[in-house]
Amino acid sequence: MADQRSKTNRWNWEVSGFEPRKSSSNASFAESTGHRTTGPLLRRNSISTPSLPPKQAIASKVNGLKEKVKLAKEDYLELRQEATDLQEYSNAKLDRVTRYLGVLAEKSRKLDQFVLETEARISPLINEKKRLFNDLLTAKGNIKVFCRARPLFEDEGPSVIEFPGDCTICVNTSDDTLSNPKKDFEFDRVYGPHVGQAALFSDVQPFVQSALDGSNVSILSYGQTNAGKTYTMEGSNHDRGLYARCFEELFDLANSDSTSTSRFSFSLSVFEIYNEQIRDLLSETQSNLPNINMDLHESVIELGQEKVDNPLEFLGVLKSAFLNRGNYKSKFNVTHLIVSIHIYYSNTITGENIYSKLSLVDLAGSEGLIMENDSGDHVTDLLHVMNSISALGDVLSSLTSGKDSIPYDNSILTRVLADSLGGSSKTLMIVNICPSVQTLSETISCLNYAARARNTVPSLGNRDTIKKWRDVASDARKELLEKERENQNLKQEVVGLKKALKDANDQCVLLYSEVQRAWKVSFTLQSDLKSENIMLVDKHRLEKEQNSQLRNQIAQFLQLDQEQKLQMQQQDSAIQNLQAKITDLESQVSEAVRSDTTRTGDALQSQDIFSPIPKAVEGTTDSSSVTKKLEEELKKRDALIERLHEENEKLFDRLTERSMAVSTQVLSPSLRASPNIQPANVNRGEGYSAEAVALPSTPNKNNGAITLVKSGTDLVKTTPAGEYLTAALNDFDPEEYEGLAAIADGANKLLMLVLAAVIKAGASREHEILAEIRDSVFSFIRKMEPRRVMDTMLVSRVRILYIRSLLARSPELQTIRVSPVECFLEKPNTGRSKSTSRGSSPGRSPVRYLDTQIHGFKVNIKAERRNKLASVVSRMRGLEQDAGRQQVTGVKLREMQDEAKSFAIGNKALAALFVHTPAGELQRQIRLWLAENFEFLSVTSDDVSGGNGGQLELLSTAIMDGWMAGLGAAVPPHTDALGQLLSEYAKRVYTSQMQHMKDIAGTLAAEEAEDAGQVSKLRSALESVDHKRRKILQQMKSDAALLNLEEGSSPIPNPSTAAEDSRLASLISLDGILKQVKEITRQASVHVLSKSKKKALLESLDELTERMPSLLDIDHPCAQREIATAHQLVETIPEQEDTNILEQSHDRRPSLESISSGETDVSQWNVLQFNTGSSAPFIIKCGGNNNSELVIKADARVQEPKGGEIVRVVPRPSVLVNMSLEEMKQMFVQLPEALSLLALARTADGTRARYSRLYKTLAMKVPSLKDLVSELE
């Protein structure tokens, strides 16, 4: 059955119903065809048999093959040379780019050096500014006293305080014994109850600036209980106190003064003093905080300090410290709370490291009265508070009076604040008082205490002293302004240098992207050259095989040659006998005509356009018998021609039905809703007519239906028929023929063979064979056009085959509307003919294919009356019954056919009509137009059998044949109209393809990637689209047969893809960054890291962050998110000393649980087979899990049957570094036996080497572990 099916499906040259014409050439062709069907499939020469001797033809064929092999070798060597030149050119380009990058790097280094030098010049100015500001504050006084009164509550009675000025406060003592019961106090600043926290802080800010400049500053909140001390320091939720405002000011000033070489850092310590004992409020909850030592002369106390990087962290730490104090409010009144902000400044240029401290002190209540009912503990607490506050007053008094000995040791409070009270330190005391008359005595006591500290300051009542200090302050301000101006200029210069550095970095990024693009182009060209080289090698191999086949066939051809000669001799004799019979018949007919002419006086003309032999009038019995014989012979010959036409029409109908099937599927939803489509047009039996059909305007781009007949570099299926036709068309040489008649005969035979091959291929394979012989057919037609020897009707049929094949595969071409046939026909002297019912239908709105006006073809037919004798003869022959009918003669039909041919030459609109309308439908429309416009040719019930219907058929056939012949005629310097239409349709398809690629690339370029997987998908998708676009461009450049390229330039505009290329370069850079982040995350997947390792990982993440400017803005979030996640992961891993990590690494062994309980979820397994020389090879399946670990699946034991597979995570080769051989064997027990057999050796070193090679071999088969393999290497 298989042999029978192969015989039935074998391709052969037989055409059903086709018999060759009875001539010498056709006879030989028929005989050769008969031999070909019975014998094996042989390759025929395109040269006709009588043209050259057989031996000479075979020798020429062999020589031609040798020349082709030689040309193929030369092409191969040229391609190799081009590849070498391209490689050298790429290397030279890369060298130039590398040198240019070096120059840019040198410029960047110089800019960095210049920035450092500029900052080195700015640093002294900044220090001088700080010194001047500190001198200004010193000139105003190192110790300042502010007074603040809180608002009066409702139940506290009247107020006893007045505010006569900004520096004076007046207290009504209500002492009638005194002449002036009011007592005045002067301070540096006095704040009434209406003053808020912001106004108070505006005067405190210079002390904060001094602390940042390097001076120790202490701010003391002093006063009686419930006077507002704690509110001044802490504030409320909506009006913050000095704690939060001081740190925010420090943070903002540090940010504005920090540079690339200088940096500020802050840490916080919070403690309280109760009964002369220090209690750390931070170390109670966090034991791992770094400590700071406080030297208290007699002892050293360690306090915990926590680093804070922003105001939110500061408030959080401060809140946790306050929570540690507890809820004993009575205890708060006898406790001193101290919040110390430690300020660290470092400069890498000058090597300067500065430490300063800002102490914010909330002192205990100052009432100091001991009641009789107070307990012993409370009395002790009050005594300690009075002692510490008194000692603080003594220290301030000694400092302001200039004494040599300062009593710091009298209290733990003064010892703690010793470094912030004397020398160049700045001290601010804020006295908080209550305006109520109930607390008058405590208020006066607080004011006296504060006045004692302030009155020791040099008196401001001396005008000379005031003038002196004002002059000093004025000079200091002027100098400070000059320094600030110079500092501002230098900062502007630094900004300009940073901008220049940024421009240089941008140039580096652009150049880097260009280098990547050059690498990509070079890689693409190399891959293309490699593929072309492989194709040439395959072609060379095929040529060798064909050459060997031809040599084997030479012997068979020699045997067939003798047989063909004998057959030709027999055919020649038969032809001569037939020609003799025809001559006798013609002489008999001539005698009969002459005898009839003598009787009637007028000769009759023939009405057959295909036969040159006239028909005799039925006069005698002999002439009628001769006429019948001639008619039988002519009918046989015409039947053969009609069969070939019918086969061609069936082929055209199949192509049209296929294209209509595709378009009907697209149109099915819209046919019901369209009111302009008439049912008569939809239900016609033969496809669609030339009338306008509402097709969709745009195809579905997602389906990718835009294809050409041949797709560039796509491999086309080959068939024996296609190979034979390709060779015959390519090898056809007109120079080998003698005379134009021989050339025309050979060329037309080849075109007929093309049509016959497509017919035999059938509807399922007609597109394949058309694509296979496409280049050869178009080259053959282009080569033969200048000689004007081809049958233009055959050329038209071949062109229509290819255009309809293109229409069937291109939905956007099916939307083209063509003009109806009425636009191409008109009656003489009347302009346009009356339109048919189809043309005048109100629902029809045709859209013309061309914008220019279509000139119609004038059908010149006039009604004439015959003479009486002709009418009698016609009645005798039974041809006509009406003497008024039009006499359509052969001459008239030939003239009309010639005029139709001239009209069709170069007419692209008519070509579009032929392409989009089936031939049978088009001829039917022409017959209908003729019947409607020439009434004397109309068919009635009386003359159906008389032949009038035959006249309409003859006229429509003559017009159709003339148009078909004219459409295939070339118009120098252009090709024929159908060829021009094919070129234009191909350009439309290419334009749609390029725009489709542009739209897809634009959509992908605008899509934002969320993670590494989407980045990889986007990159591969953009690279795929770019590769397809380049393939389309290459196909356009090489497809000269369709596009008719001039001087190698592309006729299709190439849309700009700069944005898509930039996004692709950005995705490539982003992919590299994400791979490095993934590698860092993998290295950080441990429990403990060494300090050096952790520092190296963090530096690597910082370097990746610096590479982010090379990415587009759309890719920044993804990179920032991945880097931030990795940075947070590394930061959370505990660190140890390098020595501890090394000791642990020596003791580290892979646990059995880590091997058996690791993650074994693998998406895809890769199978490897190891042949060890035994009967059964080892089969191991390998894959990768989400942790980038190698996972294998194999039989637990080699000798066990299938089904006992186990899955294990394979440890890395580095695990075996410090293992002994026995320990390795124990580890391999948990792994499949095949792995241990392949890896174990006699020694430990040999086992490590074999295991490392085996691990690399397995990992190379897993795509996700290729980076791991490169790391191991």
Curated annotation (Swiss-Prot):
ATP binds at residues 223-230. Pfam families: Kinesin. InterPro entries: Kinesin-like_fam, Kinesin_motor_CS, Kinesin_motor_dom, Kinesin_motor_dom_sf, P-loop_NTPase. Widely expressed. Disruption phenotype: Impaired chloroplast accumulation and slow avoidance movement under strong blue light. Double mutant kac1kac2 exhibits an increase in leaf transmittance and a partial defect in nuclear avoidance response under strong blue light exposure. It is found in: Nucleus; Cytoplasm, Cytoskeleton, Spindle; Chromosome; Cell membrane. Residues 1-52, 827-847, 1136-1157 are annotated as: Disordered. Residues 59-89, 466-511, 559-595, 627-657 form a coiled coil. Part of the phosphorylation is not CDK-dependent. It comes from the Eukaryota. Residues 830-846 have a biased composition (Low complexity). Homodimer and heterodimer with KCA2. Interacts with CDKA-1. Interacts with AL1, a geminivirus (TGMV) protein essential for viral replication. Interacts with LUE1/KSS. Keywords: ATP-binding, Cell membrane, Chromosome, Coiled coil, Cytoplasm, Cytoskeleton, Host-virus interaction, Membrane, Microtubule, Motor protein, Nucleotide-binding, Nucleus, Phosphoprotein. One of its GO terms (biological process) is nuclear migration along microfilament. Kinesin-like protein required for chloroplast movements and anchor to the plasma membrane. Mediates chloroplast movement via chloroplast actin (cp-actin) filaments. Required for the chloroplast avoidance response under high intensity blue light. Mediates redundantly with CHUP1 the nuclear avoidance response under high intensity blue light. May act as a mitotic kinesin. Probably involved in division plane determination. GO terms for molecular function: ATP binding; microtubule binding; microtubule motor activity. The gene is KIN14A. One of its GO terms (cellular component) is chloroplast envelope. It comes from Arabidopsis thaliana (Mouse-ear cress). Residues 142-456 form the Kinesin motor domain. Belongs to the TRAFAC class myosin-kinesin ATPase superfamily. Kinesin family. KIN-14 subfamily. Changing residue 845 to A: No effect on cellular localization. This is Kinesin-like protein KIN-14A.
